[in-house]
A protein has these predicted regions:
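N-terminal cap/lid segment of alpha/beta-hydrolase-fold proteins
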Residues: 51-112
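Short, surface-exposed "cap/lid" segments of acyl-processing enzymes
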Residues: 102, 110-150
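Catalytic nucleophile-loop/oxyanion-hole region of alpha/beta-hydrolase
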Residues: 126-127, 153-186
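Primarily recognizes the serine-hydrolase "nucleophile elbow" in alpha/beta-hydrolase
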Residues: 174-235
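Active-site nucleophile elbow and catalytic-triad environment of alpha/beta-hydrolase enzymes
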Residues: 253-275, 296
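Short beta-strand/loop motif that positions the catalytic acidic residue
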Residues: 276-286, 290
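Conserved alpha/beta-hydrolase "acid-adjacent" motif
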Residues: 291-297
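Catalytic active-site module of serine/aspartate enzymes centered on a nucleophile-bearing elbow/loop
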Residues: 316-351
Length: 351
């Protein structure tokens, strides 16, 4: 699969000085392989040398709390805060889904091949602040992370669809297969809002990722529609075949087709929840003051998913405004606990 790379700026990551200080010594050798050989002799830690060399060869960008460290003089390098701070390299990755549409994502590569995949919500993108905060937490833990745009969203190809729950789960399958072929150990899938539905649907169909985190996903998909489409939406869509959703200025935001609405209404969250393997660890986090999806939906997931843990955050809304650190801590703690203390064998795909 072809990969496309571009310069990425990142904030909030700590790069050890032992690795970052190697970049000024690279004197522009004639080839990427020459750079890698030179770095192998310079770096005192083999995995750090590999990551710095990979970034220097054009396969990604070494990032730190001031952005692209390779573009800064050594005197500008941030001080080393901890000898255990991970090196992180970011790559822009293109992955084809089953329809041939290119899904665009960012791989945050640490020295570990353990990987968490993060999924955005309705009308959001891979740059959603919730996902960015989670990526920062995982990479500081030394775990690689990948965030991407579902088809029809953000930079990815395809047409935006109102429903598309099954298609987004299929997009996620394409991503999992891609990284599995690259020999990554995919340890967890994390999704916010509609992305939570995507990771749960994935788990109900495939039994190959051991940890699932559903943040504010919706159980009762028949609810919440009139908030976006207005009253009497069924009569209107049956009459015209579609409904145009406009913003407060009267500008068209997106069109809801009858087929996409039917896709949402026919997605059975009860059946899919019960189909998740008891060997899969599932965490649902929900805000008690969620103004988009009621907390009762989280309790419904808890009632029907076999191996499930529920956390209700008393003061949090749908975006976890003012509670971002607590959300990140819950997600990271759950993944860390089951990653390092799991006793069950690696899950196998359902036949």
């Amino acid at each position: 699969m072809r990969q496309e790379h571009r310069s990425i700026l990142s904030v909030g990551r700590s790069i050890p000085s032992r690795a970052a200080s190697l970049l000024p010594q690279l004197d522009s050798p004639p080839s990427a392989s020459a750079r890698i050989r030179k770095l192998a002799t310079l770096a005192p830690h083999r995995r750090d040398a590999y990551l710095v060399a990979k970034c220097a060869s054009g396969q990604g960008e070494l990032v730190g709390n001031r952005g692209l460290l390779g573009h800064l003089p050594s005197s500008s390098m941030p001080p080393q805060k901890s000898p255990q701070s991970p090196v992180t390299c970011e790559q822009r990755v293109l992955i084809s889904n089953e329809h041939g549409e290119k899904l665009v994502g960012l791989l945050h590569q640490t020295s570990s091949k353990k990987l968490v995949i993060l999924c955005h919500g309705f009308r959001a993108t891979k740059d959603d602040s919730i996902l960015v905060d989670l990526v920062d937490a995982f990479t500081k833990e030394g775990i690689s992370a990948f965030r991407f745009d579902f088809s029809g969203n953000g930079e990815s190809e395809g047409e935006f669809q109102y429903g598309s729950y099954r298609k987004e789960a299929a997009d996620l399958r394409s991503v999992v297969l891609y990284f599995s072929k690259q020999k990554y150990d995919i340890i967890a899938l994390v999704g916010h809002s509609k992305g939570g539905n995507a990771v749960l649907l994935y788990a109900s169909k495939y039994n190959d990722v051991p940890i699932i985190v559903n943040i504010s996903g919706r159980f009762a998909l028949e609810r919440g529609i009139d908030g976006r489409l207005g009253k009497n939406f069924m009569q209107r869509i049956n009459k015209d075949g579609y409904i145009d959703v406009k913003n407060r200025k009267g500008e068209l935001e997106y069109r809801v087709s009858k087929a996409s609405l039917e896709d949402r209404l026919s997605t059975d969250t009860l059946l899919s929840s019960r189909a998740i393997s008891k060997d899969c660890r599932v965490l649902t986090i929900h805000g008690a003051k969620d103004e988009i999806v009621p907390a009762e939906d989280a309790r419904q997931f808890a009632a029907h998913i076999p191996n499930h843990e529920l956390r209700i955050m008393a003061e949090a809304n749908h975006r976890y405004t003012g509670h971002e650190a607590e959300l990140t801590s819950l997600v990271l703690g759950f993944v860390r606990r089951h990653l390092y203390h799991r006793s069950t064998p690696r899950l196998r795909p359902k036949l």
